[in-house]
Amino acid sequence: MQKLVAFWQLMRADRPIGTYLLAWPTIWALMIAGAGEPPLRIVVIFLLGTFVMRSAGCVINDFADRNYDGHVRRTRQRPIPAGRISATEAMIGFIALLAIAFGLVMQLNTETVMLSFFAAGVAALYPFCKRWTHLPQIVLGIAFSFGIPMAFTALESDQWFIAGLLFLANILWTVAYDTEYAMADREDDLKIGLQSTAILFGRFDRLAIGLLQLATLALLGWILHLITVELWVWLALAAIFLLFAYQHWLIRHREPGKCFQAFLHNHYIGMVFAIGLAVHYWF
C-alpha cells in the first residue's frame, strides 16, 4: 500500500494542476475542431490521455532529476529522493504509463497515432533539457501543446491555420506560466546548476512573462475573430487579461511562494477560455 501511495504521489495525481494545464488547451482544440460538438468517445479518450501522459511526464521528470531534487527545498520529499520509490521502479512505472497511453491513442486514426509518437518523445526529452539549455520551458510548451494538432487530426478537421495559432498561443502561455514556476525554484536551481527561463530572463523576468502573456492574448483574440464569435464572448478574453494582471500582482516581489501561487492560478486561464468557446458554440 505504501508503494501505491508513493507512486500516486510520483505521478502527481494528488496535485492535478499539471493535468488541468494539459487538458484545457486540448479541450479548446476539441471544441474548435468539432464545432462545439466533438464526439463524447473522443473527448473521453483525450481526457484520459492527458491524465496518463501528464503522469508519465512527472515520473520521467523525477527520474531525470533524482540526483537534484534532494537539494531543492520544494522537492526533497518527493518519492525518489525520499527513498520511497527506486529509480528502477520509476522507469517501470513510466513504461507502463506509456503503454496505457498507447492503448488509448490506438483507438484513434493513423495520423493521430503518428503524432502521439512525437508527443511522447518531446515529453521524455523535456526533463533532461534543464541541463543544457536555458529554454526548457519552450520544450515543455511544445510537449503541452501536442494535444492540439492531435485533436484536429482525430476529428479530421481542415482548420489548420487556426490549429497552428492555437498551438503557438499555448506554447507562449506555457513558457509564461512555467517561468513563474521556475521563479519559485530559481535560487536552488542556480546552486545546483540547472537552467531555466527564469534564470535567463533575470531581472527582466516579469517583463518577459508580460510580453508572453500579451502575445498569447493576441493569438487567442485572432482565433476568436476567425471563428466569428459574438461580441460578448470577447468578455472571456477580457477576463483572461485581468487574471494575468492578478498574476503580476502576485509575483511583483518575486517571493517563491507567491510565484508558485501565480503558476497555479493559470488553471483559471484555461477554464475561462474554454467557457468562452462553450458559450460561442452552445448558446
Curated annotation (Swiss-Prot):
Membrane disposition: Multi-pass membrane protein
GO biological process: ubiquinone biosynthetic process
Keyword Transferase: yes
InterPro entries associated with the record: HB_polyprenyltransferase-like (IPR006370), Prenyltransferase (IPR039653), UbiA_prenyltransferase (IPR000537), UbiA_prenylTrfase_CS (IPR030470), UbiA_sf (IPR044878)
Catalytic activity: all-trans-octaprenyl diphosphate + 4-hydroxybenzoate = 4-hydroxy-3-(all-trans-octaprenyl)benzoate + diphosphate
EC number: 2.5.1.39
Subcellular location: Cell inner membrane
Keyword list, A-Z: Cell inner membrane, Cell membrane, Magnesium, Membrane, Transferase, Transmembrane, Transmembrane helix, Ubiquinone biosynthesis
GO MF terms held by the record: 4-hydroxybenzoate polyprenyltransferase activity
Pathway this chain belongs to: Cofactor biosynthesis; ubiquinone biosynthesis
GO CC entries: plasma membrane
Enzyme class, first EC level, given as a word: transferase
Top-level taxon in the UniProt lineage: Bacteria
Cofactor(s) required, per the database record: Mg(2+)
SS bond partners: none
Listed transmembrane segments: 16-36, 40-60, 85-105, 108-128, 135-155, 160-180, 204-224, 226-246, 263-283
Function: Catalyzes the prenylation of para-hydroxybenzoate (PHB) with an all-trans polyprenyl group. Mediates the second step in the final reaction sequence of ubiquinone-8 (UQ-8) biosynthesis, which is the condensation of the polyisoprenoid side chain with PHB, generating the first membrane-bound Q intermediate 3-octaprenyl-4-hydroxybenzoate.
Family that this chain belongs to: Belongs to the UbiA prenyltransferase family.
PANTHER family with a match to the protein in the record: 4-HYDROXYBENZOATE POLYPRENYLTRANSFERASE, MITOCHONDRIAL, PRENYLTRANSFERASES
Protein name: 4-hydroxybenzoate octaprenyltransferase
Organism encoding this protein: Idiomarina loihiensis (strain ATCC BAA-735 / DSM 15497 / L2-TR)
Lineage: Bacteria, Pseudomonadati, Pseudomonadota, Gammaproteobacteria, Alteromonadales
Gene: ubiA
